[in-house]
Amino acid sequence: MAEENVIFVGKKPTMNYVLAIVTQFNNNSTSRIVIKARGKAISKAVDIAEITRHKFIQDAKYDEIKLDTESLQGEKGESNVSSIEIVLTR
């Protein structure tokens, strides 16, 4: 899958990500988009997927949802961070 079909969720407003997904579905004629998030952004990723499905692209469906734990090196040693991948298809 092309990297352009991946949305990395961070600190931007939720609707920015929703708009990016809607734009990719409409302009790139892609049928599959992956939403990725880690840590505190996981709840925002779920909100983004739900807003996209219920308000903008009603025929979008969840193809796959992956949960994982990633180990990150920080100042205080290694820490575990949860991550999610939500695959939307149309």
UniProtKB/Swiss-Prot annotation:
InterPro entries: Alba-like_dom_sf, DNA/RNA-bd_Alba, DNA/RNA-bd_Alba-like. One of its GO terms (molecular function) is RNA binding. Acetylated. Acetylation at Lys-11 decreases DNA-binding affinity. It comes from the Archaea. Pfam families: Alba (PF01918). The keyword Cytoplasm applies. SUPFAM superfamilies: AlbA-like (SSF82704). The modification N6-acetyllysine is found at K11. Its main location: cytoplasm. GO terms for biological process: chromosome condensation. GO terms for cellular component: chromosome; cytoplasm. It is found in: Cytoplasm; Chromosome. Keywords: Acetylation, Chromosome, Cytoplasm, DNA condensation, DNA-binding. Belongs to the histone-like Alba family. Binds double-stranded DNA tightly but without sequence specificity. Involved in DNA compaction. NCBIfam families: DNA-binding protein Alba (TIGR00285), PRK04015.1 (NF003088). This is DNA/RNA-binding protein Alba. The lineage of its organism: Archaea, Methanobacteriati, Thermoplasmatota, Thermoplasmata, Thermoplasmatales.
